[in-house]
């Protein structure tokens, strides 16, 4: 059995193909529950996100994983064959560590992928398709990801608008748990802003949107993390004073937050500072607002320059992170080899003990039947020696015939080291 990683991601497959082989939790749970009864492939974890679908498994070959992935999604293997990547053992371990650390993500260093991989492992555990060996590989990958995030700067710089706004709020306000945030428009960009700020632990989220349906949808997505209030778009100006952070991204052709509205809001707030972020083009917020004392106004260009600089810093940090991942992968592989060697040594000892017991039984029987003790002991020693050295002798002969002289020389040298050690006088 080998450890394999096989799949597709944003670099190897179109979104149309990724959609075809994506799994939701319920369907995947049912498939895994069925799979645990198949001896040929019953030890696997499937990671499925919008940017990747990957199968990690202990298996005889990668082809069985490819066939399973195709069959599970009712598509021909030929549709996948030119888009999948596959890694085995050391390369598969390194790949899993890179994925969990965010080094293989579309957004370099993104933190969400680690949680997604952990959820994938948990789902497979529920379906009983995770052996102790497979589990240990994943747990070590999580350890590697934690080391990468804590010891390098690969995830410490905002590289998305939503995350950048959240980080900006932390810089302006030191205690997020006391903040009230207003998102003006509940589209894709502000949804990310709302989710990042909700995860950060803000006190309240006010959603101001023209469409009540979209506002309700966003509210449902974050309600488990933060108190949510929805207001009509027509009530925007009179509620501005309640927000410590305002993020606006309406797509309107005209400004929706006027200078006078912000000035009035500041007065109602007794001039407590406000962070206002304008993610819209054309702009939603009157740029003259920046002149008001207590208002921090940031636009798309301001944030983009920060993101570009941060992305460069992440890329630089990623070089250090890659070195760390390779070192940790090597450590795990070495540990696995030592463990495997321990099992082999135990089996070898047991085999030698069985030979010794058989020869000893034969010698005792000879003595019992009146055999000459000296001859019996000599025969016992000779037969035991022959049987114990026979496998090593055969190994040396085969190594000498092989086309790899390095292996034969290595074997000779190690045997010589053993001889030299045995010849040393015992103290």
UniProtKB/Swiss-Prot annotation:
The record marks 95 as: Important for activity. Substrate binds at residues 49-52, 105, 110-112, 116. Pathway: Porphyrin-containing compound metabolism; protoporphyrin-IX biosynthesis; 5-aminolevulinate from L-glutamyl-tRNA(Glu): step 1/2. PROSITE patterns: GLUTR. The active site is at residue 50. Its EC number is 1.2.1.70. Pfam families: GlutR_dimer (PF00745), GlutR_N (PF05201), Shikimate_DH (PF01488). It catalyses: (S)-4-amino-5-oxopentanoate + tRNA(Glu) + NADP(+) = L-glutamyl-tRNA(Glu) + NADPH + H(+). SUPFAM superfamilies: Glutamyl tRNA-reductase catalytic, N-terminal domain, Glutamyl tRNA-reductase dimerization domain, NAD(P)-binding Rossmann-fold domains. It comes from the Bacteria. GO terms for molecular function: glutamyl-tRNA reductase activity; NADP binding. Catalyzes the NADPH-dependent reduction of glutamyl-tRNA(Glu) to glutamate 1-semialdehyde (GSA). Belongs to the glutamyl-tRNA reductase family. During catalysis, the active site Cys acts as a nucleophile attacking the alpha-carbonyl group of tRNA-bound glutamate with the formation of a thioester intermediate between enzyme and glutamate, and the concomitant release of tRNA(Glu). The thioester intermediate is finally reduced by direct hydride transfer from NADPH, to form the product GSA. Homodimer. Possesses an unusual extended V-shaped dimeric structure with each monomer consisting of three distinct domains arranged along a curved 'spinal' alpha-helix. The N-terminal catalytic domain specifically recognizes the glutamate moiety of the substrate. The second domain is the NADPH-binding domain, and the third C-terminal domain is responsible for dimerization. This is Glutamyl-tRNA reductase. The lineage of its organism: Bacteria, Pseudomonadati, Pseudomonadota, Gammaproteobacteria, Moraxellales. The gene is hemA.
């Amino acid at each position: 059995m080998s450890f394999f990683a096989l799949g597709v991601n944003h670099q190897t497959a179109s979104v149309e193909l990724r959609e075809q082989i994506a799994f939701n939790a319920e369907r995947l749970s049912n498939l895994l529950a069925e799979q645990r009864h198949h001896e040929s492939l019953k030890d696997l974890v499937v990671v499925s996100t919008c940017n990747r679908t990957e199968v990690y498994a202990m298996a005889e070959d990668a082809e069985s994983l490819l066939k399973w992935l195709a069959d599970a999604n009712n598509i021909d293997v030929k549709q996948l064959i030119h888009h999948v990547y596959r890694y085995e053992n050391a390369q598969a371990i390194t790949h899993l560590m890179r994925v969990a650390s965010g080094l293989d993500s579309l957004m370099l260093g993104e933190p969400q992928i680690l949680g997604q991989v952990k959820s994938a492992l948990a789902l497979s555990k529920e379906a009983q398709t995770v052996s102790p060996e497979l589990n240990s590989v994943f747990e070590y990958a999580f350890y590697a990801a934690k080391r990468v995030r804590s010891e390098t700067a690969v995830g410490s710089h905002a590289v998305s608008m939503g995350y950048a706004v959240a980080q900006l709020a932390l810089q302006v306000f030191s205690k997020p748990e006391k903040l009230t945030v207003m998102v003006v428009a509940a589209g894709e960009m502000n949804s990310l802003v709302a989710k990042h700020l909700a995860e950060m632990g803000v006190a309240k989220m006010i959603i101001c949107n023209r469409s009540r349906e979209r506002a309700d949808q966003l509210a449902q997505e974050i309600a488990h993390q933060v108190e949510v209030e929805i207001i009509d778009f027509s009530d925007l100006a009179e509620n501005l004073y309640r927000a410590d952070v305002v993020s606006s991204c309406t797509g309107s052709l005209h400004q929706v937050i006027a200078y006078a509205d912000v000035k009035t809001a500041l007065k109602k707030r007794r001039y407590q500072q406000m962070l206002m972020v304008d993610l819209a083009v054309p702009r939603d917020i009157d740029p003259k607002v920046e002149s008001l004392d207590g208002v921090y106004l940031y636009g798309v260009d301001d944030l983009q320059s920060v993101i570009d600089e941060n992305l460069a810093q992440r890329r630089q940090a990623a070089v250090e992170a890659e070195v760390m991942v390779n070192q940790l992968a090597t450590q795990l592989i070495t540990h696995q080899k030592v463990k495997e060697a321990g099992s082999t040594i135990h089996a070898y000892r047991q085999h030698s003990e069985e030979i010794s017991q058989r020869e000893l039984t034969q010698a005792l029987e000879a003595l019992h039947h009146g055999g000459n003790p000296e001859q019996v002991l000599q025969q016992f020693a000779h037969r035991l020696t022959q049987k114990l050295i026979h496998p090593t002798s055969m190994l040396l002969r085969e190594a000498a015939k092989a086309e790899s002289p390095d292996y034969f020389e290595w074997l000779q040298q190690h045997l010589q080291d053993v001889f030299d050690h045995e010849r040393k006088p015992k103290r």
